[in-house]
């Protein structure tokens, strides 16, 4: 179980309200990281981008899904590979984050990998 939570306040949220929410969460024993209210926040945008790049490598025949995950687990000491992470947080969530990032920033780097699109539309995970 995590003891850290991220909190992003919308523009219409007062500083007093945000501080009160942080105080409540801290009283419940959670450590709070205050983040800017931007698309994807910090963790999901990073996980989504890693998963998207790994999915593109699989789609282009560079490696298998298992090999991509093993490379990241063993090569950079991630607790899970990016595709396993995508499956555990929900491939539909990854798809949605990438689409929102693409709409918000208009940059091609947020283009959803065809493999992720195929699997989401088929209702299937990347592994399995």
Where are the regions a protein language model picked out?
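NAD(P)-dependent Rossmann-like dehydrogenase/reductase catalytic/cofactor-binding core
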Residues: 1-128
